[in-house]
UniProtKB/Swiss-Prot annotation:
CDD domains: HTH_ARSR, S24_LexA-like. SUPFAM superfamilies: LexA/Signal peptidase, Winged helix' DNA-binding domain. It comes from Deinococcus radiodurans (strain ATCC 13939 / DSM 20539 / JCM 16871 / CCUG 27074 / LMG 4051 / NBRC 15346 / NCIMB 9279 / VKM B-1422 / R1). GO terms for cellular component: protein-DNA complex. NCBIfam families: lexA (TIGR00498). Represses a number of genes involved in the response to DNA damage (SOS response), including recA and lexA. In the presence of single-stranded DNA, RecA interacts with LexA causing an autocatalytic cleavage which disrupts the DNA-binding part of LexA, leading to derepression of the SOS regulon and eventually DNA repair. This is LexA repressor. Its EC number is 3.4.21.88. InterPro entries: ArsR-like_HTH (IPR011991), LexA (IPR006200), LexA-like (IPR039418), LexA/Signal_pep-like_sf (IPR036286), LexA_repressor (IPR050077), Peptidase_S24_LexA (IPR006197), Peptidase_S24_S26A/B/C (IPR015927), WH-like_DNA-bd_sf (IPR036388). Homodimer. Pfam families: HTH_20 (PF12840), Peptidase_S24 (PF00717). GO terms for biological process: DNA repair; DNA replication; negative regulation of DNA-templated transcription; SOS response.
Length: 210
């Protein structure tokens, strides 16, 4: 917890979140159990520190910032960029905060995660044990990475999909894995891959060679 975020200030932010949109300083003071004078002082400090939005009006509702959500464990700090080529000095102060992991990944309603088993998609950085973000869709465009159900498999598979006449070709991103072809009516598309969450140690990637 940041040193300036004392237990009292943390309680104020948590109470503001609990009370929701429209929460006033008076309501938060009552929720936390402090005086109106004390809440006024703490609110001013929290605004200066960037944990509460600036006041639109003197008695307007309190609004927590993304920085506050991150400090309360509801978001992740973004510490700038890191170089993959020439070494760069790591930044010590966060330049921004993401309000949640959903916002960081750009998730939409209905999106879900699947854990990957196997190494057929390592060429695009999807490793065994990683998670892929899937956006439900009954169809995908040629070349998109899709989650599909195929004949003889009880589980869905992750492959790059192409249409060829009445057939569907499913290709891996690993030259050691064979391509698969099925009649289009036997393939059921569950959705398209829109993101990846890597959770394992770095490994060697493979790329498809034509």
């Amino acid at each position: 917890m940041p040193p300036e975020l004392t237990p009292t200030r943390r309680s104020i932010l948590q109470a503001t979140l609990r009370l929701g949109a429209g929460a006033t300083a008076g309501q938060v003071a009552q929720e936390v159990g402090i005086t109106k004078q004390a809440i006024s002082q703490q609110v001013n400090i929290l605004r200066k520190l960037g944990y509460l939005q600036p006041a639109e009006t003197r008695y307007g509702p309190l609004q927590v910032t993304d920085r506050a959500r991150a400090a309360l464990g509801e978001g992740l700090p973004i510490y700038g960029q890191i170089a993959a080529g020439i070494p760069a000095l790591a930044e010590q102060s966060p330049e921004d905060f993401t309000p949640s992991i959903e916002a960081l990944l750009g998730l939409k309603a209905g999106d879900f995660l699947l854990r990957v088993r196997g190494e057929s998609m390592t060429g695009i950085g999807v490793m065994d044990g990683d998670y892929v973000v899937v956006r439900p869709a009954p169809e995908v465009h040629d070349g998109e990475v899709a989650v599909v159900l195929v004949p003889g498999d009880n589980a869905a598979t992750l492959k790059r999909l192409y249409h060829f006449g009445q057939d569907i070709l499913l290709t891996s991103e690993n030259p050691a894995m064979p391509r698969l072809s099925f009649p289009a009516e036997q393939v059921q598309v569950q959705g398209r891959m829109v993101g990846r969450v890597g959770v394992g140690a770095p490994r060697v990637s493979h790329r498809v060679t034509e």
